[in-house]
């Protein structure tokens, strides 16, 4: 991964690098590989993530269709 440093502005380059790494999922990958994960734990985690994704998608779909509010007290328009 490469980030350009312009006008010796290292702070800006560091922020850009962190943003790129976050977008690519590198921080999450490093956290996952920090220790050994048993195959059974991996399956359970992946299943829980899939359930979470499915619920989130269903919630978004219901909000779009106007079945539930957007969580801010007023229904979506």
UniProtKB/Swiss-Prot annotation:
Coiled coil: none
Family note: Belongs to the bacterial ribosomal protein bS21 family.
Alphabetically ordered keywords of this record: Ribonucleoprotein, Ribosomal protein
Pfam families linked to this entry: Ribosomal_S21
GO cellular component, one term: ribosome
Chain segments carrying region Disordered: 38-77
Matching PANTHER family: MITOCHONDRIAL 28S RIBOSOMAL PROTEIN S21, SMALL RIBOSOMAL SUBUNIT PROTEIN BS21M
Basic and acidic residues bias spans: 38-52
Biased composition (Basic residues): 53-62
MF terms (GO), sorted A to Z: structural constituent of ribosome
Keyword Ribosomal protein: yes
Example GO BP: translation
NCBIfam families, sorted: S21p
HAMAP family the UniProt entry points to: Ribosomal_bS21
Gene this chain is encoded by: rpsU
Name listed for the protein in its UniProt record: Small ribosomal subunit protein bS21
InterPro entries in UniProt: Ribosomal_bS21, Ribosomal_bS21_CS, Ribosomal_bS21_sf
Superkingdom field: Bacteria
